[in-house]
Amino acid sequence: QKRDSTDTLIVDASKGFVKSGKNNMLRAGDIRRIVDVVAARADVEKYSRLVSRDEIRENDYNLNIPRYVDSSEDPETWDIYASMFGGIPANEIDALSPYWEAFPGLRGELFDVQPNGYAQCKDDPAAIVNGHASVLEFEENYRRAFDGFGDFLHEHLVSRCETVKVSREENLLTQDIFTRLDGIPLVDRYAAFQMLHEQWTTVSLDLEMIQREGFDTIRAIDPHMVVKKKNGKDQEVQEGWEGRIIPFDIVQKTLMPEQVKAVAELEERLEQAQFELTDLVDSLSEEDKMELSDVLNDDNDAFLATPLNREVKILRKTSKDEDWEEGTPEFIMIRAKNLRDESSHLKKDIKKKKADIEDLTRKTIEILSKDDINRLLDTKWIEPLLKKLSSIPSTIISTLKDAVAALNAKYEVTFADLDGEIRKTEHELAGMLDSLTGSDTDLAALAEFKTLLAGE
């Protein structure tokens, strides 16, 4: 009632959501965009507009949003001349003007303008974009904008985990990100905010637990409970352990990489052995399957352990493994048994090593040093956000490359080209008709069809 202005801010946020099942769900970034626009009473193209009272009166006080804010996407248009003769219309290149403003000189490197005003895209536009000085400068400016951001997050979150004001911190971090993005073109700051918010959901829960239960809760271990079926009923049972704050996998990846690598190598070899065994079965000929029927299952797609072991044991009483020529039934059985035995040993070894690593992880968490805790919290809280934020420039550049490629493909094949291809195909088909034979009626029909193809 006391406002100086009588304008009404109308916002169309109907495009800002994600699908959640059957429902449309606003993300934190969508909500933040709405709040900021309303707070600033800002005019944003295709999103919001300050509408005068007089304009509303002229519309008989009809407040239907599309009357005032058109959020629809521009329809795709097709240039008649370009469709007939090729080339890319200047106005369609102009539609990418935000990129040309952000990357000076790039447009001229990508397109050769012909005397008729239409352009041709140069070869390998993706490589031109990737190597252009303005694009490289954009990437470097973005990287510099976030110099020290990891240290900033560490100081605010990790170093002050017991005292940081959780309810206020997300907004402080948001303002820092927005400040860093000032002057960086093309970046949607609300996409960056969404990345922060998604990570903050995890960080804030951890911070609240640390402040509620004390710093030592970081060293706490809890039973890992899972729901399993027992006698037809769901029952919660313990399946190992888990860190209350620090997940086991982060501890293992950060503090015991050699042990994790050793298990990964065993798992890789197990996968290879199982592949080789499957490939061995798949390569069997029908004759092989007949000769090996005693050691194969009814579907002939797997070896049976007991008869296979028995047959190989008999073979080894009278000969050495290397005595058998590759491809013989004896060689195949020995190879299959060796692969099965190797797989069995690998599975046992992997299971034992994983149990040892889990036990070591549990003991390690319980005696973590302050330095180790800082390192692990950095890995859980900060590194995922830094990784997401660092992907923004490449996403923007990929979008531009896709748009240029689409423009190039749109008019690459003209109607004249298509007509030529059709005529060529019709001519080839008409030629093939001459080689066909049939009854008099069939030949008459083929002759008429050939006439149609010839356009006579």
Give residue spans per PLM region.
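A conserved structural/catalytic subdomain of Rossmann-like adenosyl-cofactor enzymes
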Residues: Q1-F248, A262-V263, E267-R269, E276-S285, ...
